[in-house]
Swiss-Prot record:
Gene: coaD
Record organism: Shewanella frigidimarina (strain NCIMB 400)
Protein's name according to its UniProt entry: Phosphopantetheine adenylyltransferase
Location in the cell: Cytoplasm
Subunit structure, as described in the record: Homohexamer.
GO molecular function terms listed in the Swiss-Prot or TrEMBL record: ATP binding; pantetheine-phosphate adenylyltransferase activity
Its job: Reversibly transfers an adenylyl group from ATP to 4'-phosphopantetheine, yielding dephospho-CoA (dPCoA) and pyrophosphate.
A Pfam cross-reference name: CTP_transf_like
Domain of life: Bacteria
UniProt KW keywords: ATP-binding, Coenzyme A biosynthesis, Cytoplasm, Magnesium, Nucleotide-binding, Nucleotidyltransferase, Transferase
Pathway involvement of the protein, from the record: Cofactor biosynthesis; coenzyme A biosynthesis; CoA from (R)-pantothenate: step 4/5
């Protein structure tokens, strides 16, 4: 347990599935960096600063976990953080093909960077940030999929989106 690992993602918002993988990674590695990508191409609902704060809230009890926002290539961020392992989550077989391609690209760009795949607990295997946002946007209750304060933040965000639509 000597390696520094990075669990990268957009975390828009952080879900119970993410939290499950972070807990697992924290048991496996000496130091885990949650790398929150700015990722403007995904048009996140929450700002980078909001997402960093949300993940800090969810991981506050884990002493070997650090949350850092970043822009640019993940392999460059990993080098800056002196990390030798990338943690990626696999919810279903359908995730594997994309993750396999990504792991090979990262290995080509940074040969010393290893990808490790973790699977969430069965009860979290279907949860994605995209689905959580869709449920919230349609007025559904997301409290079973995210931390209570994240559910409240999503509710406020949805209300703001609706106000913005009405104002146009």
């Amino acid at each position: 347990m000597h390696r520094r690992a990075i669990y990268p993602g957009t975390f828009d918002p952080v879900t119970n599935g993410h939290a499950d993988l972070i807990e697992r990674a924290a048991r496996l590695f000496k130091h885990v960096i949650i790398g929150i990508a700015s990722n403007p191409s995904k048009q996140p609902r929450f700002s980078l600063e909001e997402r960093v704060a949300q993940v800090n809230l969810v991981t506050a009890h884990l002493k070997n976990v650090e949350v850092v926002g970043f822009t640019g290539l993940l392999v460059d961020f990993a080098k800056e953080q002196h990390a030798s392992v990338l943690i990626r989550g696999l919810r279903a077989v359908s995730d594997f093909e994309y993750e396999f391609q990504l792991a090979n690209m990262n290995r080509r760009l940074s040969p010393d960077l290893e990808s490790v795949f973790l699977t969430p607990a069965e009860e979290n295997s279907f949860i994605s940030s995209t689905l959580v946002k869709e449920v919230a946007l349609h007025g559904g209750d997301v409290s079973q999929f995210v931390h209570p304060q994240i559910a409240a933040a999503l509710k406020l965000k949805v209300a703001q989106i609706q106000l913005d639509k009405e104002g146009k």
